[in-house]
Regions:
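Short helix-capping/linker segments at secondary-structure and domain boundaries
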Residues: 46-52, 76
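Short, Lys/Arg-enriched anionic-surface-contact patches
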Residues: 17-36
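Short alpha-helical "recognition helix" segments of helix-turn-helix
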Residues: 51-58, 64
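Winged helix-turn-helix DNA-binding recognition segment
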Residues: 63, 74-79
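DNA major-groove recognition helix of helix-turn-helix
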Residues: 68-71
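Intrinsically disordered, low-complexity basic tails/linkers immediately adjacent to helix-turn-helix/homeobox/MYB/SANT
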Residues: 77-93
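Short, amphipathic alpha-helical "recognition" segments used to contact nucleic acids or chromatin
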Residues: 33-48
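General nucleic-acid-binding
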Residues: 1-11
Length: 93
C-alpha cells in the first residue's frame, strides 16, 4: 500500500494523474472515485441534504453517508486535506 501511495504522488499534472488512474483502475472504479470526490465537494461547499445530493448526482445515500463520515468524523481527513489544498492553490493564483 505504501508503494502505491508513493506512486500516486508522482504525476505532476492532472493529465498525468488521469493517465495513471486510467491504467490503474477500471472505468467503473474511476467513475466511483469521481462520484465520491464530487459528493465530498458538495458536502463541503453546500447546504444540500443527502437526499438532494442523491437526486442531483444519482449517488446512493449509503455512499453519501460514507463520504460525509470520512469528510467530517474519521481521523484520516484525506478528503479534508485535498479540499483545503485545492482551495489554497486557488487562493494563491
Amino acid at each position: 500500500f505504501e508503494d502505491l501511495c508513493r506512486a500516486l504522488l508522482t504525476p505532476r499534472t492532472a493529465e498525468e494523474m488521469a493517465k495513471l488512474l486510467t491504467d490503474l483502475c477500471t472505468p467503473a472504479e474511476v467513475r466511483t472515485l469521481a462520484e465520491r470526490w464530487h459528493v465530498a465537494r458538495l458536502l463541503d461547499g453546500s447546504y444540500l441534504s443527502y437526499r438532494e445530493i442523491h437526486d442531483a448526482t444519482g449517488v446512493s445515500t449509503t455512499t453519501i453517508v460514507r463520504v460525509a463520515r470520512f469528510l467530517k468524523q474519521e481521523p484520516h481527513q484525506g478528503y479534508r486535506t485535498a479540499i483545503d489544498r485545492l482551495a489554497e492553490d486557488k487562493d494563491a493564483r
